[in-house]
């Protein structure tokens, strides 16, 4: 590419970025109204989205405790009490059949619609890349909080739309009085401090390795338990259906079911504990722990994955994560080390990620992220991702971000080894 | 003679109690309804009135005052269903102190916690 052409593209990119920013700010100006919460938990529990989220879907400390307790409000108060207080006597009587039936008070369904416009400096038609997505999800509890459930399913959309892996699972909360949460179904392994491992995105970029991702949803069983109020242990087994090779005629052999094993241990210092209890802050004395919390996590995954030759080969992942939260600042670090057996030699993978978020208020946040992927120590790939998030309502979010991707392996194929993409996405949940 | 004095003192004390009772209940009067519901601070102790100004300006930033009024009058937090007592007022105060968008400092949180404790006492009278 010539220098002038490059400059022209840079100029166009700068103008486009500025236009997006101005557009977003204009939306910010005209859409600012009082926050309204709508999705399933908000309706069921009659509380606003920010009870559990900073800007959705990112969970705050209380939201993390709510999720880890199988969607039960930390504190363990029976649902019937809530109904008595928030409803009139007449409403309470009409709701009694719901309580006796042990079903949620409201239909526990929500939907999320997404629209993404993407700019790619290396595409001929830079701006003509639109992605849409629609996702249905439901979650809640049955039987007076004894059983929680979750499902999400894409209702359609285009590749590149922001939907997660389809999941359907149930969680038994303290079954038979045993203080554990037992989850079963098609689930994404709980290996991370966050909804997904910080390195997940980077590892998925290593498509040349294989499509294996520890967080992809599989049929499995998972058990988790709090160790005291500030530590958690999770162990799971999932069942992957993997091909085992071809016969002499080149036909696939019968698909064999293979079990993978995984686990994690997490610990939290400061902040709200896993039972949703606030730290004991002295209102007469200042301490750094008034606002500081540090979470640490270590995970491991051992399993197998069939490659392009349909042969099962071992896959291992080990990782560590850390989160530091102080007032409006959030720092996240993640490192994953893994090994994939191949038909030739084992491939070693290292992914490192760091992200800093600053939440100015429930409507506006900025984020900067750095990802690094190293496969067998050759030509490491690095991606820098700055982003701005604006949520005019608690259930509507706009995100403007860019990705500056340095990938030396592309140089060998004659492509530019450094690419810049930008995207503006809008998500609406209700 | 003595019996008459005792009787007179008894009736005087009873009349005083009867007169004072409605005043105490009137301390926790509210005005408006729904989203506009608020405490009527006219019957508050003098030092609580300045604390109410903090509550009035800070707490309604994220939720209605009705939520606080229901909690104080019933002794049960309306969303969680958990008891709303002196332990809970401090826990909620700390929760709001640590909430990134509350913009409340420790002195302000302490003042609001003291006010809620005072209101709980008044509601219990």
Where are these regions (language model features)?
Chain B
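The canonical Cys-X-X-Cys-His
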Residues: 56-66, 112-116
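C-terminal segment of classical bacterial N-terminal signal peptides
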Residues: 16-24
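Extracytoplasmic/secreted proteins, especially bacterial periplasmic and envelope-associated proteins
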Residues: 50, 54, 88-91, 107, ...
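Gly/Gly-Pro-rich "capping" loops immediately C-terminal to redox-active cysteine motifs
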Residues: 51-52, 64-100
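Long, compositionally biased, intrinsically disordered segments
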Residues: 31, 86, 122-125
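Electrostatic cytochrome c docking/interface patches
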Residues: 25-55
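C-terminal capping alpha-helices of c-type cytochrome domains
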Residues: 101-125
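Bacterial N-terminal signal peptides that target proteins for export
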Residues: 2-12
């Amino acid at each position: 590419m010539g220098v002038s052409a490059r400059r022209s593209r840079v100029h166009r990119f700068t103008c486009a970025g500025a236009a997006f920013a101005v557009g977003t700010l204009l939306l910010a100006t005209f859409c600012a109204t009082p926050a309204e919460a709508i999705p399933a938990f908000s309706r069921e529990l009659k509380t606003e989205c920010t009870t559990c989220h900073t800007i959705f879907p990112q969970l705050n400390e209380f939201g993390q405790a709510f999720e880890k307790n199988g969607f039960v409000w930390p504190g363990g108060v029976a649902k019937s009490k809530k109904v008595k207080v928030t409803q009139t006597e007449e409403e309470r009587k009409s709701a009694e059949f719901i309580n006796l039936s042990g079903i949620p008070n409201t239909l526990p369904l929500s939907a999320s619609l997404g629209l993404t416009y993407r700019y790619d400096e290396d595409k001929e038609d830079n701006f003509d890349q639109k992605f849409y997505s629609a996702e249905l999800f439901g979650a809640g509890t049955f039987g007076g909080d004894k059983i929680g459930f979750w499902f999400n399913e894409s209702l359609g959309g285009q590749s590149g739309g922001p939907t997660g892996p389809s999941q359907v699972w149930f969680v038994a909360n303290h079954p038979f009085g045993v203080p554990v949460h037992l989850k079963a179904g098609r689930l994404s392994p709980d290996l991370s401090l966050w909804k997904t491992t910080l390195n997940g995105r980077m590892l998925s970029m290593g498509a040349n390795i294989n499509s294996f991702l520890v967080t992809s949803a599989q049929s499995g069983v998972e058990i988790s338990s709090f160790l005291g109020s500030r530590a958690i242990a999770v162990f799971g087994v999932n069942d992957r259906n993997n091909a085992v090779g071809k016969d002499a005629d080149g036909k696939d052999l019968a698909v064999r079911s293979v079990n993978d094993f995984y686990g994690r241990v997490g610990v939290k210092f400061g902040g709200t504990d896993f039972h949703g209890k606030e730290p004991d802050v002295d209102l007469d004395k200042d301490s750094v722990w008034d606002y500081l919390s540090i979470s640490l996590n270590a995970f491991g995954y051992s399993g197998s994955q069939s490659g392009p030759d349909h042969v099962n080969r071992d896959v291992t992942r080990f990782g560590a994560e850390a989160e530091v939260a102080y007032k409006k600042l959030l720092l996240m670090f993640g490192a994953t080390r893994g090994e994939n057996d191949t038909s030739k030699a084992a491939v070693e993978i290292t992914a490192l990620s760091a992200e800093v978020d600053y939440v100015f208020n429930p409507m506006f946040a900025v984020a900067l992220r750095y990802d690094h992927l190293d496969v067998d120590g050759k030509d490491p790939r690095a991606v820098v991702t700055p982003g701005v998030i604006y949520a005019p309502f608690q259930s509507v979010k706009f995100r403007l971000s860019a990705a500056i991707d340095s990938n030396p392996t592309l140089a060998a194929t004659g492509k530019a080894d450094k690419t810049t993409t930008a995207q503006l996405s809008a998500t609406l949940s209700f | 003679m003595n019996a008459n004095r005792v009787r007179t003192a008894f009736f005087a004390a009873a009349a005083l109690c009867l007169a004072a009772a409605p005043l105490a209940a009137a301390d926790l009067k509210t005005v408006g309804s729904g989203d506009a519901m608020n405490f009527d601070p006219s019957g508050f102790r003098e030092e609580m009135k300045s604390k109410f100004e903090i509550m009035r300006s800070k707490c309604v930033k994220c939720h209605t005052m009705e939520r606080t009024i229901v909690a104080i009058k019933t002794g049960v937090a309306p969303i969680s269903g958990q008891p709303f007592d002196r332990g809970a007022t401090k826990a909620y105060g700390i929760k709001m102190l640590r909430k990134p968008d509350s913009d409340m400092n420790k002195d302000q949180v302490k003042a609001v916690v003291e006010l809620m404790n005072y209101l709980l006492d008044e509601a219990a009278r």
